[in-house]
Regions:
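Activation-segment/catalytic-loop signature of the eukaryotic protein kinase fold
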Residues: 118
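Activation segment signature within eukaryotic-like protein kinase domains
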Residues: 155-156
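Conserved short submotifs of the Hanks-type protein kinase catalytic core
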Residues: 122-136
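AlphaC helix of the eukaryotic protein kinase fold
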Residues: 73-105
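Conserved activation segment of eukaryotic-like protein kinases, specifically the C-terminal portion
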Residues: 207-221
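Protein kinase catalytic-loop region centered on the HRD/HxD motif
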Residues: 160-171
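AlphaC helix of the protein kinase catalytic domain
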Residues: 137-147
């Protein structure tokens, strides 16, 4: 039994997540981390609470995999793995914060997630957004089957109207795919992840090959 207990403790240690922020961590003096919502190649998204306003929020942390490390049992600071990667990290952080500024321009648009704050801390950067309570369009289709063209048009109307405003500002969203669209419990539909948005006058050959997502990329990219 002692051996089994030790094995169980070892297994729990191995499974423990040491790189994301721990539950209860406070950011910027007001945002309390509650849970990890998801993780991608460039960041970690948390569910949190704004102590000042008393509302639930989503907090996106710039955490590019393979470039940084953190041991949350010691502190919350993110460390760049190799000195030669520092420039890459800093450029990425600048673009990450620019994402916040881009989304904030469209906070009055019903079909786009709202940004409420952004800041730097722990040697990295954070974007605070409204918490979206629902499922992605991808998940909805997996559960309910393919939607008719009529249903899709009705569902996507707020997003399409918001994208029209985005395009008027000289920006395009490079990934309007089902996993980037949230269907909320209150019936609203929101487009997420504006890290895939950029000025459509600034396409280079290299960036096109990296970011073009067949089937979901805007036609401006195919013409560039």
């Amino acid at each position: 039994k002692k051996s089994t207990r030790r094995e169980e403790e070892r297994r729990k240690m191995e499974e423990r997540d040491y790189h994301s922020l721990q539950k209860g961590t406070k950011l910027n003096g007001r945002y309390i981390i509650e849970d990890v919502l998801g993780e991608g190649g460039f960041g970690i998204t948390y569910a949190g609470r704004d102590e000042l306003l008393g509302v639930k929020v989503a907090v996106k942390e710039y955490y590019p995999q393979g470039i940084v490390v953190r041991n949350n049992s010691v502190d919350d600071v993110v460390t760049v793995t190799y000195a030669k990667q520092k420039d890459v990290f800093n450029k990425g952080k600048t673009k990450f914060l620019e994402e916040a500024r881009v989304i904030a321009k469209f906070n009055d648009q019903e079909g786009i997630v709202n940004v409420t704050d952004f800041f730097e801390a722990n040697n990295t950067a954070y974007i605070v957004m409204e918490y979206l309570d629902g499922i992605t369009l991808k998940e909805y289709i997996a559960e309910n089957g393919v939607l008719s063209p009529e249903d899709i048009l009705e569902l996507m109307a707020p997003v399409l109207e918001s994208l029209d405003e985005v395009h008027k500002q000289g920006l395009i969203h490079r990934d309007i795919s089902p996993d980037n669209i949230m269907l909320l419990k209150n019936g609203k539909v929101k487009l997420m992840d504006f890290g895939a948005a950029r000025d459509y006058t600034d396409f280079g050959e290299k960036s096109l090959s990296i970011v073009l997502k067949p089937g979901y990329a805007p036609e401006e990219q195919y013409r560039s």
